[in-house]
Amino acid sequence: MTIKPAVRISDGNLIIKNRTILTGVPDNVITTSASEAGPVEGVFVGAVFNKEESKHIVPIGTLRNSRFMSCFRFKLWWMAQRMGEMGRDIPYETQFLLVESNDGSHLESDGANGVECNQKVYTVFLPLIEGSFRSCLQGNVNDEVELCLESGDVDTKRSSFTHSLYIHAGTDPFQTITDAIRTVKLHLNSFRQRHEKKLPGIVDYFGWCTWDAFYQEVTQEGVEAGLKSLAAGGTPPKFVIIDDGWQSVERDATVEAGDEKKESPIFRLTGIKENEKFKKKDDPNVGIKNIVKIAKEKHGLKYVYVWHAITGYWGGVRPGEEYGSVMKYPNMSKGVVENDPTWKTDVMTLQGLGLVSPKKVYKFYNELHSYLADAGVDGVKVDVQCVLETLGGGLGGRVELTRQFHQALDSSVAKNFPDNGCIACMSHNTDALYCSKQAAVIRASDDFYPRDPVSHTIHIASVAYNSVFLGEFMQPDWDMFHSVHPAAEYHASARAISGGPLYVSDSPGKHNFELLRKLVLPDGSILRARLPGRPTRDCLFADPARDGVSLLKIWNMNKYTGVLGVYNCQGAAWSSTERKNIFHQTKTDSLTGSIRGRDVHSISEASTDPTTWNGDCAVYSQSRGELIVMPYNVSLPVSLKIREHEIFTVSPISHLVDGVSFAPIGLVNMYNSGGAIEGLRYEAEKMKVVMEVKGCGKFGSYSSVKPKRCVVESNEIAFEYDSSSGLVTFELDKMPIENKRFHLIQVEL
C-alpha cells in the first residue's frame, strides 16, 4: 500500500488531502517535501526560469470556487484582509492565504469518533524568503494564482527557486497555521515564534501614548499633564510611550524651483539626543532623563518607552553625520504602488532618506539605545520599518538590507532593554517578519484615526484578521484609542479581548473614567487575555466589513474562561478600485448572528477536569448583565447595529456530585471578566470551589444551587443569588492586601 502525501502536485493539479485546490499547475513549478522538518503535512514550492532576473512572476495554478481569506498589504506599511472565491480576487502583495475546501463541515469533530474526511480542510499558503528574494502572491484575470519573486536590486539575480512558497494543510485552521509557521521557522532558522519570545511587561498594564494628544508638539510638561490627569480618575497608567516629537531633527535647506518652492523639505535626524523641549530648563545638560524620573518617581510608572524610526527619523539620518548616512530614494515594488498609488508623489519618494551605512547601523542603534537606557528609558517603539525594502538597490537587495538592520536592532534591544522593550510598527512586510528573533509585540493594523469616521469599523476587522497571521510571530498590538469618542466603547472592548497592550492617547483632562474602569484596575494593571484575539472559525471566510450579512466574532482565552466579542463592522472597507477606505451602502442597519460556547476555539482548555465537563457553558453578557446556560452546540442570537458590539464571558460548567454544577465568571463589570481568575480548584467531596482572583469589584459566578456561604480570605461575606439564572454575585470592595496578588475565595455549595 502506498501512502500518498497530504499535499502534492499530481497531473498538473495541487491535491490537498485528496481534494483538488489548484488546477493547471505549470511544469516549471517544482515541489520539495517538508519532511526534513518532521512529519508535517506540507510542501515547499519553487520554480525554474530560463534566465536570471531580479524579478520573476510565475502562475502556480488556477483557483476557482473555493473560499479564501488573504492578508495583503494595502499600504507599504500595513496589511488588511480580503476574502474571495476566485484567483482574480487575490490582491497584489498577498503575504498570507488561507483556502477552505468546498466539502465537509467547518465544525470540529465531536470527540474521537470524528472522521477527518467529513471535515473542512484548510490550506495555508505562505510566500517566503529564499536567499535574497522575497515572494508574495497575487491573482490575475484568468483566476491563476501567481507567485511574485523579487530582490529589489537589479544586480541581484537568480533563475532557480526551490523554497519560495510553503503550502500546509489540516482540519483545524488555527493549529494548521501554527504548524505551518513552525515548519517554515525550522527551515529558515531566521525567526522565532511568539510563544518563544519574552513579552515585555507593558502588556499587563494600562498605558498612555502621547501621539493623538500632542502629535509632534509633545513636551515634558504635556507628558506630565497626561499622566497626572489619568491617575486622578482612578486609572493610573503604568507605562507611557513618548511618541514622535522628542528627537533632534532639522529640515534640509529649501530647494527653489523657478519662482516657486517645492514641497516643504523633510525632517532628518541630526543626533541621538533629545531636542530642546525635553531638556531641563534650569540645567540643559539634563535631558530626557528628567521626564523619565518624574514619570517613575512622582507618578509611579513602571515603564517609559520612546519612539524612533528604524532609519532614525522619517527622512533618515542627515548625511554627513557620524553613521555613514547616504541619500537613498525609495524604489517601490509594483504591487505596493498598485495598491497605494500615492507613493508616486510621496515626500519620501521625492526627497529621499538618509540611510545609515549597514556597516554602522549597530553602532547607531546601540549608541541611541544605550543613551536612552542610561536615562531610564525601558524600551522603544520602532516605526517606519517597511521602508527598508525600498532602499536595497546597490546593497544586495531588500531582504539583505532588512536582515542587516533587524539583526542590529535585535542585538541592541537585547543588550540595552532587558525587559525586551520593543514594539514593531509599520512593519507588515515578510522581509521583516521572517527575520524577527527579538521583538515580541507588533502593531496589528493601520492607525487609530480619531478624526476619520470611515476608519473605525475597518480598524476592528483589520486587527482581528491580521492577527491570524501576525500572531504567530508576535503579540499583536491593536493600537491606542480615545476614551472620549463616538466609537470609544467599540474600540475599548476590542482592546480588552485583544491579548495585547492596552493604552489610550487621550488629551490631558479628556477622559471617560467610567469606560476606563471596565479596562483598568486601581493599581494600573489590566485583565489581559492569553492569546492574540482572532476571528472565530466560522468567521474566517466571511467578510464582515463588506458582505452586508455577517457579524464579526473574535475569540480569546483566559486561564479558566474564554471571551467572545461580537462586532458589526459593516459599512466601510478598502476599495480595490479607488485604492482607499470608503463608506458603502448596506441593506440594513442591524444584523443578526449567533454565538455558541464552542466559538471560543480552545474553550476545552479552560476546563479543570474534562471528566466533569460535557460541553455546557455559562455565558455572561457584559453589557446586559445577563447569565445564560448554553448546552453544547446550542446557539444564542445576537443583533447589532453598525458600530455596536457585545462582549460575552464563556465559562465551562463543571458538573459535580448530586447534580450540582458551577462555573466562574469573574469581575462582571470589566470587559474581560474572566481574566480576573488566576486559580480554580473544585473540592467535590467537600462541595467547595476555591478561587484565586485579582482585582476588585463585583464578582460573579454560575451555580445550579444557592451557595451555603461565600468566604473571602477568612471572612464570610454577603452575596446575592438569582435562582432563575444561577448567577451568584458579591463585592470585592478592595484590592488584595499589599503583599498578596490575589483574593482567596471559597464558595461552599
Curated annotation (Swiss-Prot):
A Pfam family this chain is assigned to: Raffinose_syn
KW Glycosyltransferase (keyword) present: yes
Catalytic activity: alpha-D-galactosyl-(1->3)-1D-myo-inositol + sucrose = raffinose + myo-inositol
Family: Belongs to the glycosyl hydrolases 36 family.
Induction: By oxidative stress and by dark treatment. Down-regulated by sucrose, but not by osmotic treatment.
Organism: Arabidopsis thaliana (Mouse-ear cress)
Protein name: Probable galactinol--sucrose galactosyltransferase 6
InterPro entries (alphabetical): Aldolase_TIM, Glycoside_hydrolase_SF, Glycosyl_hydrolases_36
Gene: RFS6
Record-annotated disulphide pairs: none
EC assignment: 2.4.1.82
SUPFAM superfamilies, sorted: (Trans)glycosidases
Keyword tags: Carbohydrate metabolism, Glycosyltransferase, Transferase
Gene Ontology molecular-function annotations: galactinol-sucrose galactosyltransferase activity
